[in-house]
Amino acid sequence: MKVFYVTAECWPFAKTGGLGDVSYALPKELKKEGVDVRVIMPKYSTIPSYLKDQLKEIAVFSVRVGWRNQYCGLLEMELDGVKFYFIDNEFYFRREDERKSIYGYGDDAERYTFFTDAVLEAISRIDFYPDVIHINDWHTGMLPLILKERYATLEGYKNIKTMYTIHNLQYQGVFDKHVLYDILDLPQKYFDNGDIEYYGSINFMKAGINFADKIITVSPTYANEIQTSFYGEQLDGLLRKESGKLKGILNGIDYDLNDPAKDKDIFVHYDVDSINKKVENKLRLQDILGLKKDSSIPLIGIVSRLVSQKGFDLIAYMMPELMREDLQIVVLGTGEHQYQSMFNYYDSNFSDKVSARITFNASLAQQIYAASDMFLMPSLFEPCGIGQMLAMRYGSLPIVRETGGLRDTVTPYNKFTGEGNGFSFKNYNAHEMFFCLKNAIKVFKDKEKWIKLVENAMKTDNSWKKSAKEYIETYRDICD
């Protein structure tokens, strides 16, 4: 099985969100399972120097973008047994603000159309004709259509299948209609028949949904949710129409990078057989953050983008009530000004209960996972979610709303059987969240029950191994 994995970002080269994590971890696991997988992405100027120094140029060619030809360099390197290729063009992938974000530029449609065309041209240059091209999110959504329109009759290309993973339906790549002629150079019929048209504009994600052989979302529940008007972002009708090729496969987490038994960022190592050592991380973090050192006070962790999607409206509404409870909250993240200001206020005025770090610090994130007793994720919607899986890996019990991947990964505590690996509530309601949290605190005070739940959480298999096997099975299905 040969798979060409096409992504706009991949850790450790360039990462803005979960796509970057998946693009590193999934191919690595696929390789372990015997798949000949190769990854291709843009060569951004922000790739760390120690990695840039390892890149080797293997080809130079021109790529046609609309009416013009553009230079394209092709470079390669190997990391963790996986071969990575990089599409080089400084006009598109060297930006002054790239350190802040690799996306969000006025010419993004042109940048990622160039990237898509370059990927298809690169296939013959590296003599790697895959069984499946696996594309991700809106940036590469046009690839199946361009493959069909320009390459379908070429030797080596005609039997290639495409799989399209939607990591977040909210970001669709919607651009002005002129993109069709000036950049994509595609026939008018694809706009007129609605295949890529979206309220008078061009929609890259819609193209991917229509023309890919298989559509994947990052959890089974999210695959169902996006077929409804509430979650469907105005593509729910199309997704219902294409439901026969839609499937949800949960993301995993990298168990090598996230292991409390050997994580270099945490204070004290522990595993499921030495859970009693976890509390040392809590006491150390309380001390560092200026919170009262007390193992009996439940410590609630939040590591997240501070945006409305993540349920911070609910938290903001209940903060006055939460401040009356015997608990501590540690927050790490950046995002919308209103939530940053809210957490800064409580950090200043309730410093014995709240510590807010309005930044992102990877080491501190790991320390919060290891130190916290509970991990709060009351998301409005959550395609998959990584935080709850990392929390379970480190023995911090997730408190989540039952949506998307949160519903698929967190089994709520059953007080009659003692089963479960976290706590959950159903409706997007602040008081439901609050009562769920209070229930978790009540169970926390019963150490025997709590330790059993922590053991359940740490034994939950959220590794990429399970997910990779599902992907391989799906690759085979579309190739048969």
Swiss-Prot record:
Pathway: Glycan biosynthesis; glycogen biosynthesis. SUPFAM superfamilies: UDP-Glycosyltransferase/glycogen phosphorylase. It catalyses: [(1->4)-alpha-D-glucosyl](n) + ADP-alpha-D-glucose = [(1->4)-alpha-D-glucosyl](n+1) + ADP + H(+). ADP-alpha-D-glucose binds at residue 15. Keywords: Glycogen biosynthesis, Glycosyltransferase, Transferase. It comes from the Bacteria. One of its GO terms (biological process) is glycogen biosynthetic process. Its EC number is 2.4.1.21. Coiled coil: none annotated. Pfam families: Glyco_transf_5 (PF08323), Glycos_transf_1 (PF00534). It is an enzyme of class 2 (transferase). One of its GO terms (molecular function) is alpha-1,4-glucan glucosyltransferase (ADP-glucose donor) activity. NCBIfam families: glgA (TIGR02095), PRK00654.1-1 (NF001898). Synthesizes alpha-1,4-glucan chains using ADP-glucose. Belongs to the glycosyltransferase 1 family. Bacterial/plant glycogen synthase subfamily. This is Glycogen synthase. The gene is glgA.
